[in-house]
Amino acid sequence: MNSFSAFSEMFGSDYEPQGGDYCPTLATSCPKKPAGRKKFRETRHPIYRGVRQRNSGKWVSEVREPNKKTRIWLGTFQTAEMAARAHDVAALALRGRSACLNFADSAWRLRIPESTCAKDIQKAAAEAALAFQDETCDTTTTNHGLDMEETMVEAIYTPEQSEGAFYMDEETMFGMPTLLDNMAEGMLLPPPSVQWNHNYDGEGDGDVSLWSY
């Protein structure tokens, strides 16, 4: 039994196409706008929505909340397809039938969370990604057919995160892999000393007030 079969048995077929009247909007029919950053390497997947590649070669997924500027972080995955499935289930949970999907069958093959709570969406995204994981991945499968190894889905969410939590990858945004490290090191450096090269008769090395200028 493959991962998807186990996934279907666990969650049923509540999301099968109904009467063939629903035709989801696909990412392939909505070309992406060129990125405005010309000096930085493009990290977005050329086709899949909500999918970006890290410098390590892994793929991350996130989804924008409707009518907000915040995004819900969905996780880090081994393949772009897993990240794309994670985005699809999140998009369906937040936008329903108006969601733009990476795969047409996501509309009826994925378990949609009952609420739009960030934690519920993140959990459903992880389940969807693992159910459609690449068969070439050498992983161990649990009795339910879902691979729950940390190497497959990393940093999905923590209990401390609020429902409105979102993720921003500054290192990828600014094209500087060591941006945060450099900032941290800079904060540890002492401030430069101020030397005054002025001679005042009878004053020697006395302090000079900034307001005297």
Swiss-Prot record:
It is found in: Nucleus. Signal peptide: none annotated. Residues 47-104 bind DNA. It holds the Pfam family AP2. Keywords: Activator, DNA-binding, Nucleus, Stress response, Transcription, Transcription regulation. GO terms for molecular function: DNA binding; DNA-binding transcription factor activity. One of its GO terms (biological process) is positive regulation of DNA-templated transcription. Induction: By cold stress. Subject to degradation by the 26S proteasome pathway in freezing conditions. The keyword Manganese does not apply. The keyword Nucleus applies. One of its GO terms (cellular component) is nucleus. A motif (Nuclear localization signal) lies at residues 32-44. Transcriptional activator that binds specifically to the DNA sequence 5'-[AG]CCGAC-3'. Binding to the C-repeat/DRE element mediates cold-inducible transcription. CBF/DREB1 factors play a key role in freezing tolerance and cold acclimation. Interacts with 14-3-3 proteins GRF1, GRF3, GRF5, GRF6, GRF7, GRF9 and GRF10 in the nucleus upon freezing. Belongs to the AP2/ERF transcription factor family. ERF subfamily. This is Dehydration-responsive element-binding protein 1B. The lineage of its organism: Eukaryota, Viridiplantae, Streptophyta, Embryophyta, Tracheophyta. The gene is DREB1B.
